[in-house]
Amino acid sequence: MSQMENMAVPAVGNMSKEELLELKKAMNAKALAKRRTRTALRVTANVVFAVLILLPLLYAISIALMPSSELFTTELNLFPKNPTFSNFINAFRTVPLLRFILNSFIMAGCITIGQIITCSLAAFAFSFLEFKGKGILFMVVMATMMVPGEATIISNYLTVSGWGMLDTYQVLIVPYLTSAMGIFLFRQFYMTFPISLYESAKLDGCSNLKFIVMILLPLTKSAIGAMAVYTFINAWNMYMWPLLVTGSNNMRTVQIGISMLDSVDSQSITLMIAGVVMIIIPSISIFIIGQKQLIRGMFSGAVKG
């Protein structure tokens, strides 16, 4: 035994150094066993909760692959005995689902890009510029978050109808090109930067737009990622507004297409579930890809600001 070990473990009472070392090893082994037990219980609980959360999705995929003759029986069929992709094929044949998916991608993509641009510009003004009534104006913008969309949907419809914008991409995109939530998110992130950063850039002859594009946006990638994921998923899942302002299949979105799959025949449920499985793939993929950015962006401004 080295001199360091002799100094680190002195004899206590009637116990020798060797007995103390054995006691220390036993205590460490016991603590390690407890830690491993807690970890195993935690992992088991997480797996159980994950299975419970994924169970509806897994059962939906099972129904989508199940012939209607297997679904409507007295037996409880959790898994298809004869898996088939006919439900997916029939879903595309019943309604122009590809067109609906394209429309939803165009709408969600344009809304996402538009909100990132407008919200970042507004947040810059609220964070770095000084003007009369800035605090009151920001409170008014935040107050709009308390107004449900259903309360203004009729007035918005009358407005776009008077402008002749019905059944166009503009009517799907323009009303959602900005949001109070996005302004708040970017402002909280911008508030983490010192005002001296903006003042130094102005002294170097940097314009406001150049300061946003060249300095702010590269430093707020996590906020942009969080905003992009949040906005895209919300736009992809919109139902009431597209249903109200579109009338032709050329402008319908996927959420309306799913409701069109619900007919009176016995295959309607399997067709509808097959359509649901197809349209949730993009939103789930976007969420999985941008999950880290979403969490980081949502919490960074809250913690630092």
Please describe what each predicted stretch is.
Residues 1-39, 71-93:
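Membrane-topology segments of multi-pass transport proteins
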Residues 38-305:
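A structural signal for multi-pass alpha-helical bundles of membrane permease subunits
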